[in-house]
């Protein structure tokens, strides 16, 4: 074993020299230089500064503008709530622990931080899945005369919470465990050892298949069908400038969605899968830390992609920020979201 395993931690550093200390009791400066911990803290501070205002503003703008309270936006609001969970449940804790160089809140704090960070991340991930399905059903119309309504949105939101809890809760009750990861300043599920006494192998397989591979397949399928449908509609209406514009907008939105999903989650999932399938191999804390912290940036990407690219929401946000006056004019802001729920090609 190239790491040092304790009862509730795994430090990716051999203890042959006797320098390894519990990440709950002492700074981990033998894993990385102090300035590197400071860089992590600065990064988390940046995510808090960017993530909190835009997600909070999303909730506030929706309360202020009644026309935004549509079924589709229920999912977008759920996404904002998930991102706020990550900001308050994970980012603030990680900022504080990074400044100290170790996880100062102990095993109980690690469980709480790991749970809330995982819960927020999973709610966000499954919200993206629900959005993908909603766009597929509305635009591609696999079921004739189906209209995405309030009840469907509520069921979608409930589904995201059920799936998120199904991933975040098991480590709290003995199926796997939350431990400090990478540079030992943030916590996540254990994937470094098999740990048969807590059935860790089965949990990691379950998490990778159900909470990563399946969402990825669903998102690619739905948006692949979406692009195909828009292109087909454009081919049948060559003169339609509206359709041509819709094709470009939807295609651009889909490309950004897929790229952002891969950028945020594929490196983390890939590293976790590699470590899990190469037990005993040599890997350093930086190798584990960078993908995990990069995945956290989804709290900033999400509102930019799924809300800022929504013209109506963007204009309502500008109206709120500019004290009731939209500097871009009122025509675009008056477009209703219901249009996107009945159109075959219009993006959200």
Curated annotation (Swiss-Prot):
Residue ranges of the TM segments: 37-61, 74-96, 111-133, 153-173, 203-224, 253-274, 287-308
UniProt source species: Ovis aries
Residues involved in Zn(2+) binding: 201, 279
Motif ('Ionic lock' involved in activated form stabilization): 134-136
Posttranslational mods: Phosphorylated on some or all of the serine and threonine residues present in the C-terminal region.
Record-listed N-acetylmethionine modification sites: 1
Sequence similarity: Belongs to the G-protein coupled receptor 1 family. Opsin subfamily.
GO molecular function terms noted in the UniProt entry: 11-cis retinal binding; G protein-coupled photoreceptor activity; metal ion binding
Marked site: Plays an important role in the conformation switch to the active conformation: 113
Modified sites of kind Phosphoserine: 334, 338, 343
Membrane topology: Multi-pass membrane protein
Protein's name according to its UniProt entry: Rhodopsin
Functional summary from the UniProt entry: Photoreceptor required for image-forming vision at low light intensity. Required for photoreceptor cell viability after birth. Light-induced isomerization of 11-cis to all-trans retinal triggers a conformational change that activates signaling via G-proteins. Subsequent receptor phosphorylation mediates displacement of the bound G-protein alpha subunit by the arrestin SAG and terminates signaling.
């Amino acid at each position: 074993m190239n790491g040092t395993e304790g009862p509730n931690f795994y430090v990716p550093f051999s203890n042959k020299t006797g320098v390894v200390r519990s990440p709950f009791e002492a700074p981990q400066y033998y894993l990385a230089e102090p300035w590197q911990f400071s860089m992590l803290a600065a990064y988390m501070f940046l995510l808090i500064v960017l993530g909190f205002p835009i997600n909070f503003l999303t909730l506030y703008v929706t309360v202020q503008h009644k026309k935004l309270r549509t079924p589709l936006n229920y999912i977008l609001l759920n996404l904002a709530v998930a991102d706020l969970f990550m900001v308050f449940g994970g980012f603030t804790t990680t900022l504080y622990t990074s400044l100290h160089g170790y996880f100062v809140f102990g095993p109980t704090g690690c469980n709480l931080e790991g749970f809330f960070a995982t819960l927020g991340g999973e709610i966000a991930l499954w919200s993206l899945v629900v959005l993908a399905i909603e766009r597929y059903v509305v635009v591609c119309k696999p079921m004739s005369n189906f209209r995405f309504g309030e009840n469907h949105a509520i069921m979608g939101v409930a589904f995201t919470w059920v799936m998120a809890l199904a991933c975040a809760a098991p480590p709290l009750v003995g199926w796997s465990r939350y431990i400090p990861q990478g540079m030992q300043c943030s916590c996540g599920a254990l994937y470094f050892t098999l740990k048969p006494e807590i059935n860790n192998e089965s949990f990691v397989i379950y998490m990778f298949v159900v909470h990563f591979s399946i969402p990825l397949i669903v998102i690619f399928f739905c948006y692949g069908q979406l692009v195909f449908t828009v292109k087909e509609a454009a081919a049948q209406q060559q003169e339609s400038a509206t359709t041509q514009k819709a094709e470009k907008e939807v295609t651009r939105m889909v490309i950004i969605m897929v790229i952002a999903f891969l950028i945020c989650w594929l490196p983390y999932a890939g590293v976790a899968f590699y470590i899990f399938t190469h037990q005993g191999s040599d890997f350093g804390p930086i190798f584990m830390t960078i993908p995990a912290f990069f995945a956290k940036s989804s709290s900033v990407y999400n509102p930019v992609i799924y809300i800022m690219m929504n013209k109506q929401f963007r204009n309502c946000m500008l109206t709120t920020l500019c004290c009731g006056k939209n500097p871009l004019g009122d025509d675009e802001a008056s477009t209703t979201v219901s249009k996107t729920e009945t159109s075959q090609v219009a993006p959200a």
